[in-house]
Amino acid sequence: KPQQKIMKKIILITGGERSGKSSYAERLAHELSASPVYMATAKIWDEEFRRRVERHQQNRGPEWTNIEEEKELSRHDITGRVAVIDCVTLWCTNYFVEQPEVSLALEALKQEFDRFTAQDATFIFVTNEIGMGGVSPNEVQRRFADLQGWMNQYIASKADQVVLMV
């Protein structure tokens, strides 16, 4: 029996911290696939965080394929799969730390996003909506907010569906 071809789909889930974005993304992925992929973009910076990541992986269950990738999402072939990418904010951070020039970091992120989403898969991106809290007095934070906001806009412009969690 021929395998049914997945139609490429991009979904962006945005909202504030602790708004239920990740839980919603995971539920959605589970509805769409019996064996979804979870791509974590977080950099593991200490043992406590490592334990937290392991706890999250165990809570998701054995049907999930867990991938840790800080920057180069396109290195992973997820053709035909449903993937949660959690999260865009940390992914942007990983680029910004290495390239604090916002325009260059943004261009690198857009290129990587386009390479990654060229695959025939369902992509569920989770991001923080950081633009609703006012302007930071800190110049580095303002630059990062610009990067994050512009990347969110870019993903939203490519998305088939955008969900705001409140």
Predicted segments with their positions:
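Short, Lys/Arg-enriched N-terminal segments with co-localized hydrophobic residues
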Residues: 1-6
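Conserved P-loop
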Residues: 8-77
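Structural motif
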Residues: 12, 82-84, 124-126
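Residue-level signal for inorganic ion chemistry
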Residues: 25, 56, 84, 128, ...
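Glycine-rich phosphate-binding loop signature in dinucleotide/nucleotide-binding domains
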Residues: 32, 77-81, 118-120
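Short, well-ordered beta-strand core segments
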Residues: 36, 83, 161-164
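Helix-adjacent hinge/juxtasegments
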Residues: 62-108
